[in-house]
Swiss-Prot record:
GO biological process, any: base-excision repair
Subcellular location as annotated: Nucleus; Mitochondrion
The name this protein goes by in its record: Adenine DNA glycosylase
GN (gene name): Mutyh
Protein EC: 3.2.2.31
Native source organism of the sequence: Rattus norvegicus
């Protein structure tokens, strides 16, 4: 039992994952290199000495010009109508324009465009300027961000807004270098996107979509997360960016990767740069090689074992995959598995509807500052989960209910690095009247208040299980597992107080009125 830890009080503090929009680890949002000096410069010089075949480069300026022209022409006709693009186009104030780009880029990290649109619209309506965001509470930020995932993004965005307002005179840094230097949570990609789109700085960007486009047009099959390939991709992006329309070019490259040059089933026949694509040429080469007298097609001049950009000899070209051979995905560790028991505690509300108990997570670590149902972390075996959960509930105290602890089902939620399985329970408190004082770190909410509170997607899944069960639509076991204090034999000294569990009342408290 010593290994059973109450997650609401002592959950292992691990930083939330900050992966960018499908982006490989080419640049960390935590890193702040303003230039290449010392060891970084030496390492880059060594990398630059590594031979690279022209096959993986844009050696002909005519190809660069054609790539820019074709891509921008396609973008002008096919670009999606997105709210942040409209706002940037209409906004004349440079700081507000940069803020609009900044918010969109942070929200789009590892999140689909369709999901972001509604969040972005509500965010900009609530906080249209950096000053508005800087004056908001973290609770309000978490509340609006609820369900978007990677919650530290919202917190870092607000930290950046406050720094701009309080330390930089309300002016957003104008270059990618200073953006990355001065603003928390702004890495190389985000800095380049803001600088090029808002300020027209001629600087390239590399995110997951751009990686895919560049790897295919130049047949780069090596691991895109390696230092050598990373440097090469950033160099290509900088070489290709259009000096007259850098922001549009970068958005066009990302748009191409998102809508045409997709991870699976790319629409090559609709690609504006198909004629310049080495991967597409490689597919054609395979078809022609079966014909007599087929012409030679350009290939990498280096031996595959020597070239650090070609497909590795251990994982060569697969004709069945076509252009999807590029880029090859780096191997990922599976998320570690964790287990938790969580309980939806309810009592009658003043208006007749039920109130449910939420407690706040620590201010650092996974899901920092968000609200959740009382929960405990379990051993993989799941043994003693009832007892552990009752101990956690006892922490919040009130008279012992006659209703048993009831098992409702199981919820599985996968974070970027954790697969968390929740065993969901409910507990009904009878005849309780909320008091007038607030117990720190806890609140009673109505169902409607819960839906608008700063809670994670995992807790929303838990609530749905509880809601379905309460409405009689849950398709769980006909004989749900239950545990009551009276069912335990010879309770320990620490458990003897369960007959007074929930001794102090926890009052109703609206989500936006809790102090941090």
């Amino acid at each position: 039992m010593k290994k059973l830890r109450a997650s609401v009080r002592s959950h292992k503090k691990q930083p939330a994952n900050h992966k960018r929009r499908g982006k490989c680890a080419l640049s960390s949002s935590q890193a702040k290199p303003s230039g290449l000096d010392g060891l970084a410069k030496q390492k880059r010089e060594e990398l630059l000495k590594t031979p690279v075949s022209p096959y993986h480069l844009f050696s002909d300026i005519a190809d660069v010009t054609a790539f820019r022209r074709n891509l921008l022409s396609w973008y002008d006709q096919e670009k999606r109508d997105l709210p942040w693009r409209k706002r940037v186009k209409e906004e004349t104030n440079l700081d507000r324009r940069a803020y609009a780009v900044w918010v969109s880029e942070v929200m789009l990290q590892q999140t689909q465009v369709a999901t972001v649109i509604d969040y972005y619209t509500r965010w900009m309506q609530k906080w249209p300027t950096l000053q508005d965001l800087a004056s908001a509470s973290l609770e309000e930020v978490n509340q609006l961000w609820s369900g978007l995932g990677y919650y530290s993004r919202g917190r870092r965005l607000q930290e950046g807004a406050r720094k701009v307002v309080e330390e930089l005179g309300g002016h957003v840094p104008r270059t990618a270098e200073t953006l990355q230097q001065l603003l928390p949570g702004v890495g190389r990609y985000t800095a380049g996107a803001i600088a090029s789109i808002a300020f027209d700085q001629v600087t390239g960007v590399v995110d997951g979509n751009v990686i895919r486009v560049l790897c295919r047009v130049r047949a780069i099959g090596a691991d895109p997360t390696s230092s050598f390939v990373s440097h090469h991709l950033w160099d290509l992006a900088q070489q290709l960016v259009d000096p007259a329309r850098p922001g549009d070019f970068n958005q066009a490259a990302m748009e191409l990767g998102a809508t045409v040059c997709t991870p699976q089933r790319p629409l090559c026949n609709h690609c504006p740069v198909q004629s310049l694509c080495r991967a597409h040429q490689r597919v054609g080469q395979g078809r022609l090689s079966a014909l007599p007298g087929s012409p030679d097609i350009e290939e990498c001049a280096l031996n595959t074992r020597q070239c650090q950009l070609c497909l590795p000899s251990t994982n060569p070209w697969d004709p069945n995959m076509g252009v999807v051979n590029f880029p090859r995905k780096a191997s990922r560790r599976p998320p570690r598995e964790e287990y938790s028991a969580t309980c939806v505690v309810e009592q009658p509300g003043a208006t007749g509807g039920p109130l449910i108990l939420l407690v706040q997570r620590p201010n650092s670590g996974l899901l920092a500052g968000l609200w959740e149902f009382p929960s405990v972390t379990l051993e993989p075996s799941g043994q003693h989960q009832h007892k552990a959960l009752l101990q956690e509930l006892q922490h919040w105290s009130a008279p012992l209910p006659t209703t048993p602890l009831q098992h409702l089902g199981e919820v599985i939620h996968v974070f970027s690095h954790i697969k968390l399985t929740y065993q969901v329970y409910s507990l009904a408190l009878e005849g309780q009247t909320p008091a007038s004082t607030t117990l720190p770190g806890a609140r009673w909410l109505t169902w409607e208040e819960f839906r608008n509170a700063a809670v994670s997607t995992a807790m929303k899944k838990v609530f749905r299980v509880y809601e379905e069960h309460r409405r009689g639509t849950c398709k769980g076991s006909k004989r749900p597992q239950v545990c009551t204090p009276s069912s335990r034999k010879k309770p320990s000294r620490g458990q003897q107080v369960l007959d007074r569990f929930f001794q102090r009342h926890i009052p109703t408290h609206k989500p936006n009125s809790t102090t941090q």
